[in-house]
C-alpha cells in the first residue's frame, strides 16, 4: 500500500533552511496528520540545540523517530561542540550500532556557517546552495525559496516563512502555522 493511503501513517511537516546576508533561518509548519485527519495544527518542529542555542534544527517524519534523532544529535553536539563533527560522529554510530536501525525521519540542522541534512539511515548531506527543504512540502518550499532568493532582497527569515506559507497552500500535509528560528 502506498504510505499516503495508509490511515495509520503520520504525515507531517515541511521544514526549510535558508541562508542570506550572513544569517540562517530554519522554519517549519505546525501540522500533524494521521491518515486523512489533521491531529494537530500547532506542533513545534523547529528548535535551538546545543549549550548556547547556536544550532537550529527542524525535523520531518515520524515524531518518535525524529525525537530520537534530536536526542542523539544533541548528545553528539554537546560532546563535540561543532555541527559538522557532531553530524559525522552520529553517522558513524549509525553504521556500527544495530539498535539505531532505520529511523523514519530527517533532521535539517544549521549553524552560522553550515547547513546539513541528517537522515534516519545515517547519511549526512550538505546542500550545495545552502538551502535545505525536507518533508512532505519540501519540494514546494525549495522552489519558493530559490525564486525568492533569486528575485528579491528579502531576508532569510522572511524567505523561510514565505516558503512554508507557499508550501502550505499546495501540500495537504502542511499548514501556514509557521515557527521560525534565526541566527
Swiss-Prot record:
Activity regulation (record text): Allosterically activated by HslU binding.
Entry's Gene Ontology molecular function annotations: metal ion binding; threonine-type endopeptidase activity
Keyword Acetylation in annotation: no
Sites where the protein binds Na(+): 168, 171, 174
One Gene Ontology cellular component annotation held by this UniProt entry: cytoplasm
EC number(s) recorded for this UniProt protein: 3.4.25.2
Gene Ontology annotations of biological process type: proteolysis involved in protein catabolic process
Major location category of this protein: cytoplasm
SUPFAM superfamilies cross-referenced by the UniProt entry: N-terminal nucleophile aminohydrolases (Ntn hydrolases)
Substrates-to-products reaction catalysed: ATP-dependent cleavage of peptide bonds with broad specificity
Oligomer status and interactors: A double ring-shaped homohexamer of HslV is capped on each side by a ring-shaped HslU homohexamer. The assembly of the HslU/HslV complex is dependent on binding of ATP.
HAMAP family referenced in this protein's UniProt entry, alphabetically: HslV
The name this protein goes by in its record: ATP-dependent protease subunit HslV
Organism annotation: Xanthomonas campestris pv. campestris (strain ATCC 33913 / DSM 3586 / NCPPB 528 / LMG 568 / P 25)
Amino acid at each position: 500500500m502506498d504510505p499516503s493511503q495508509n490511515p495509520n501513517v503520520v504525515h507531517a511537516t515541511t521544514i526549510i533552511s535558508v541562508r542570506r546576508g550572513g544569517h540562517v533561518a530554519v522554519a517549519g509548519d505546525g501540522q500533524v496528520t494521521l491518515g486523512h485527519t489533521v491531529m494537530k495544527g500547532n506542533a513545534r518542529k523547529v528548535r535551538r540545540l546545543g549549550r548556547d542555542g547556536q544550532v537550529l534544527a527542524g525535523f520531518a517524519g515520524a515524531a518518535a523517530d525524529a525525537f530520537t534523532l534530536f536526542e542523539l544529535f544533541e548528545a553528539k553536539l554537546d560532546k563535540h561542540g561543532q555541527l559538522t563533527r557532531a553530524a559525522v560522529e552520529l553517522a558513524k554510530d549509525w553504521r556500527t550500532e544495530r539498535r539505531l536501525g532505520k529511523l523514519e525521519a530527517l533532521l535539517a540542522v544549521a549553524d552560522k556557517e553550515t547547513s546539513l541534512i541528517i537522515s534516519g539511515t545515517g547519511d549526512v548531506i550538505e546542500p550545495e546552495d545552502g538551502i535545505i527543504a525536507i518533508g512532505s512540502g519540501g519540494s514546494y518550499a525549495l522552489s519558493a525559496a530559490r525564486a525568492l532568493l533569486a528575485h528579491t532582497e528579502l531576508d532569510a527569515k522572511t524567505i523561510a516563512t514565505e516558503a512554508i506559507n507557499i508550501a502550505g497552500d499546495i501540500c495537504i500535509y502542511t499548514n501556514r502555522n509557521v515557527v521560525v528560528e534565526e541566527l
